[in-house]
From Swiss-Prot:
It holds the Pfam family zf-MYND. It is found in: Cytoplasm; Nucleus. SMART domains: SET. Residues 272-428 are annotated as: C-terminal domain. Its EC number is 2.1.1.354. InterPro entries: H3K4_H4K5_MeTrfase, Hist-Lys_N-MeTrfase_SMYD3, SET_dom, SET_dom_sf, SMYD3_SET, TPR-like_helical_dom_sf, Znf_MYND. S-adenosyl-L-methionine binds at residues 14-16, 124, 132, 181, 205-206, 239, 259. The lineage of its organism: Eukaryota, Metazoa, Chordata, Craniata, Vertebrata. It catalyses: L-lysyl(4)-[histone H3] + 3 S-adenosyl-L-methionine = N(6),N(6),N(6)-trimethyl-L-lysyl(4)-[histone H3] + 3 S-adenosyl-L-homocysteine + 3 H(+). Zn(2+) 1 binds at residues 49, 52, 71, 75. Residues 4-240 form the SET domain. This is Histone-lysine N-methyltransferase SMYD3. The gene is SMYD3.
Length: 428
């Protein structure tokens, strides 16, 4: 983190925030942070390493709890300080597995009990985080009470009563903080692999048209400016998936973060008409089917994902255009499934259809579009379509040098693809 570039401040209406203390350029790194605590999300358990969050076919299982898995002895050794105490808890609760929020809070508690300062709390600590308890519905509060009971059962091997918790630590409030302050950690392909707490980054407020973006390199978080930012200007990120209508965005922001968005995009319903193009009855059916597809995708069940996507795409070929966000999400899932199953020609067919909608819905420099364009360029390269591949790989590089930065591992991969493509063009 470079503290001279940003500072904490009190906004007029939105509580605390972060603002620029120096003029910022697109692509400038504003903040880097390891998490206070993180854990593999349930769907990726056993598929990615519990420490570096990278996928690998054969993972080493922790010999004690037999739940945590690692890609190497090196990762297992580095993970031990964070895993040591939860190991007993995971072992004792088998065959049940705790919700992600329970395992995450357990790791937070152990970290706070250790008392060692964390760089992730440099501007804002876990104790400073907003809980929004006074804005929660009774149903939400009951859900938190259930989590507290689950947590107490999960942690019983290490913590038998409240006196063993950190000073002034309230479990109900702690879960409320976790729910509205945790970040979904995505891998290079933008697949959800983990969940983590980055207290200082939680100072960032939401915008449906943000001036910053976040990407991850394993569990390491990088915050960059995506456009010019003036001194004193607030730094913002988008808390949500951009492929959502204004109504969907407002509902999720209300339900999860307890505020009403009144930005220009929400007030004018910007791009909503494009997003919902096509037969309403059909896209509502696809919207419902996507819940099952996303669940299968989260558990890396690619054959089932592809089968469902193919059936939907085939039946709706004349009724839903690719710009419809639910059709677009199905195409995207179909492409990812094909890539993971080694069906590269079919993956390119689906990926190519997403390019124009992605240009419309992810304008400017957005990491999701950058990664998508890179995927399509890489598929074209493997199919021998060198001029087309070069065009898309260059476009991906222009986007990702802003969103990811030259030191990100994905940019290194992209540069190698550009060099390979250039060599093939020269040789042909």
């Amino acid at each position: 983190m470079e503290p001279l570039k940003v500072e904490k401040f009190a906004t007029a209406k939105r509580g605390n925030g972060l603002r620029a203390v120096t003029p910022l350029r697109p692509g400038e790194l504003l903040f880097r942070s390891d998490p206070l605590a993180y854990t593999v999300c349930k769907g990726s358990r056993g598929v990615v390493c519990d420490r570096c969050l990278l996928g690998k076919e054969k993972l080493m299982r922790c010999s004690q709890c037999r739940v945590a898995k690692y890609c190497s002895a090196k990762c297992q050794k580095k993970a031990w300080p964070d895993h040591k105490r939860e190991c007993k808890c995971l072992k004792s609760c088998k065959p049940r597995y705790p919700p992600d929020s329970v395992r995450l809070l357990g790791r937070v508690v152990f970290k706070l009990m250790d008392g060692a300062p964390s760089e992730s709390e440099k501007l804002y600590s876990f104790y400073d985080l907003e809980s929004n308890i006074n804005k929660l519905t009774e149903d939400k509060k009951e859900g938190l009470r259930q989590l507290v009971m689950t947590f107490q059962h999960f942690m019983r091997e290490e913590i038998q009563d409240a006196s063993q918790l950190p000073p002034a630590f309230d479990l109900f409030e702690a879960f409320a903080k976790v729910i509205c302050n945790s970040f979904t950690i995505c891998n290079a392909e933008m697949q959800e692999v983990g969940v983590g707490l980055y207290p200082s980054i939680s100072l960032l407020n939401h915008s449906c048209d943000p001036n910053c973006s976040i990407v991850f390199n394993g569990p390491h978080l990088l915050l960059r400016a995506v456009r010019d930012i003036e001194v004193g200007e607030e730094l913002t990120i988008c808390y949500l998936d951009m492929l959502m209508t204004s109504e969907e965005r407002r509902k999720q922001l209300r339900d999860q973060y307890c505020f009403e968005c009144d930005c220009f995009r929400c007030q004018t319903q910007d791009k909503d008409a494009d997003m919902l193009t096509g037969d309403e009855q059909v896209w509502k059916e696809v919207q419902e089917s996507l819940k099952k597809i996303e669940e299968l995708k989260a558990h890396w069940k690619w054959e089932q994902v592809l089968a469902m996507c193919q059936a939907i795409i085939s039946s709706n070929s004349e009724r839903l255009p690719d710009i419809n966000i639910y059709q677009l999400k199905v195409l995207d899932c179909a492409m990812d499934a094909c890539i993971n199953l080694g069906l590269l020609e079919e993956a390119l067919f689906y990926g190519t259809r997403t390019m124009e909608p992605y240009r419309i819905f992810f304008p400017g420099s957005h990491p999701v579009r950058g990664v998508q364009v890179m995927k399509v360029g890489k598929l074209q390269l493997h199919q021998g379509m060198f001029p087309q591949a070069m065009k898309n790989l260059r476009l991906a590089f222009d986007i990702m040098r802003v969103t990811h930065g030259r030191e990100h591992s994905l940019i290194e991969d992209l540069i190698l693809l550009l060099e390979e493509c250039d060599a093939n063009i020269r040789a042909s």
